[in-house]
A protein has these predicted regions:
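Short alpha-helical DNA-recognition segment
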Residues: 16-36
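Residues within the helices of the helix-turn-helix
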Residues: 9, 20, 50
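Short, charged recognition helix plus adjacent turn
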Residues: 36, 54, 61-78
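A short, Lys/Arg-rich alpha-helix, primarily the initiator
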Residues: 1-14
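Residue-level signal for the short linker/turn that defines the boundary of a DNA-recognition helix
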Residues: 6, 17, 29, 44-47
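Residue-level detection of the helix-turn-helix DNA-binding "recognition helix"
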Residues: 13, 27, 38-41, 68
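The alpha-helix within a helix-turn-helix
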Residues: 12, 23-24, 53
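Short, basic-rich loop-to-helix N-cap that marks the start of a DNA-contacting helix
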Residues: 41-54
């Protein structure tokens, strides 16, 4: 699955956060560390993504909105 970076950026802006603020909350001293990820220049790791989503106020159950390829749930036989 691929992270929808446009959605990530839109949600950050909707929450009123700057790249500097997100980077700071991630514990990074430089905005560029976050900006490179948001712009697709550096891959976002699983733990980084979970932390960014949490900073934006999303629970783990809501993370699916950030993925471009949603896999349908498998139906289990009764």
């Amino acid at each position: 699955m691929k992270i929808n970076l446009k959605r990530l950026k839109a949600e950050r802006i909707a929450k009123g956060l700057t790249q500097d603020e997100v980077a700071s909350r991630m514990g990074w001293k430089d905005r560029a560390l976050y900006a490179k990820r948001e712009n697709g220049l550096v891959d976002i790791g699983v733990n980084e993504f979970a932390n960014i989503a949490s900073i934006l106020g999303f629970s783990r159950d809501e993370l699916g909105i950030f993925f471009e390829d949603n896999v349908p749930e498998r139906k289990l036989p009764n």
